[in-house]
């Protein structure tokens, strides 16, 4: 009986998917990861290296790698690309000065062979802050409309309040089911 249940789970649910959470420092990557996991704000020191957590949903679970990107070690991201199905790019919507760097990093990732089939979810974080950039402005600056080879979605959010986060896990789950 146990083997039958295990077989049914392998066919109909409990699929594992690898996710990398990337972005420049202080964008909110770790806060978003732990909001998904615990639904609480976890106050932490800046991440050194990476964090990995498993987010379990009824039919899917995601292994999420929160990867720091120190300027001198940007090449380190490549080591996490193998088997990645989803890229979550976190952007600080208040930081116009580093948006060019974010765009360059995004297109480097999308050009990488190991990520050719990855779906992209962009969180425009800190939407609760006055004068933050809106989705239209960020989409335009990142030239998201030119991305044709990857499924992508941009979502405004506030990691501290969790606004905009839950529905995106559902988007990832539906993307995973479609593939």
From Swiss-Prot:
SUPFAM superfamilies: P-loop containing nucleoside triphosphate hydrolases. The keyword GTP-binding applies. GO terms for cellular component: cytoplasm; trans-Golgi network. GO terms for molecular function: GTP binding; GTPase activity. It comes from the Eukaryota. Keywords: GTP-binding, Lipoprotein, Myristate, Nucleotide-binding. One of its GO terms (biological process) is vesicle-mediated transport. GTP binds at residues 23-30, 66-70, 125-128. SMART domains: ARF, SAR. It holds the Pfam family Arf. The keyword Signal does not apply. A lipid is attached at residue 2 (N-myristoyl glycine). PANTHER family: ADP RIBOSYLATION FACTOR-RELATED. Belongs to the small GTPase superfamily. Arf family. Binds and exchanges GTP and GDP. This is Putative ADP-ribosylation factor-like protein 5C.
